Amino acid sequence: MTDNLQLTHLVDACRWIGAKGWAPATGGNMSIRQNDAFCWLSESGKDKGSLTIDDFLQVDIASNRAPSGRKPSAETGLHTLIYRLFPEANAVLHVHTVNATVLSRLVKETELRISGFEMQKSLTGQSTHLDTVTIPVFDNDQDIDALASRIAHYAQERPFNYGFLLRGHGLTCWGRDVAEARRHLEGLEFLFECEMRLRQLEKI
């Protein structure tokens, strides 16, 4: 698949995300892998529902630098980390949904465990509601290098799939292509909403 076609799919996903209100106030960032050395990442400060192909910057996966000199997203280091940690990841979506942001603060543990929901099967490799989907939860940090280091250390100790939550911040998820990343995002967001409602009802 050509870079332009991949970027077109990513722009479509960004507009879909924007229409759902999942990246408010220019928040969030999205990318695709170009090859082993570079990715295309959304430029900082842009409304995600209005992005065009020209709003994506080529970024060096090893150095986090944009050869063009333009400013990539604040969380560039998280995207490049995912591409280094997960060779199968070719698209990354980082969003600020209400469910992900609030649920990440309700979970006091380092992992969110979800089970019993049919929609777990929206995640690649999940075949039954009887399994448990584990989503790591990391404390937010404005020092992205330090945060990336913590995530990398966790991944060495406890390999994980699909995505992770940043406490009080949002969800980062990925897939083998834009379509899979988008499906993982929609599936996880649905599961987070179910988990939120279940926790609310259990308190009544």
From Swiss-Prot:
GO terms for cellular component: cytoplasm. Pfam families: Aldolase_II. Disulfide bonds: none annotated. It catalyses: 5-(methylsulfanyl)-D-ribulose 1-phosphate = 5-methylsulfanyl-2,3-dioxopentyl phosphate + H2O. Keywords: Amino-acid biosynthesis, Lyase, Metal-binding, Methionine biosynthesis, Zinc. One of its GO terms (molecular function) is zinc ion binding. Pathway: Amino-acid biosynthesis; L-methionine biosynthesis via salvage pathway; L-methionine from S-methyl-5-thio-alpha-D-ribose 1-phosphate: step 2/6. It is an enzyme of class 4 (lyase). Its EC number is 4.2.1.109. The keyword Amino-acid biosynthesis applies. Binds 1 zinc ion per subunit. One of its GO terms (biological process) is L-methionine salvage from methylthioadenosine. It comes from the Bacteria. Zn(2+) binds at H94, H96. Its cofactor is Zn(2+). Belongs to the aldolase class II family. MtnB subfamily. HAMAP family: Salvage_MtnB. NCBIfam families: PRK09220.1, salvage_mtnB. Catalyzes the dehydration of methylthioribulose-1-phosphate (MTRu-1-P) into 2,3-diketo-5-methylthiopentyl-1-phosphate (DK-MTP-1-P). This is Methylthioribulose-1-phosphate dehydratase.
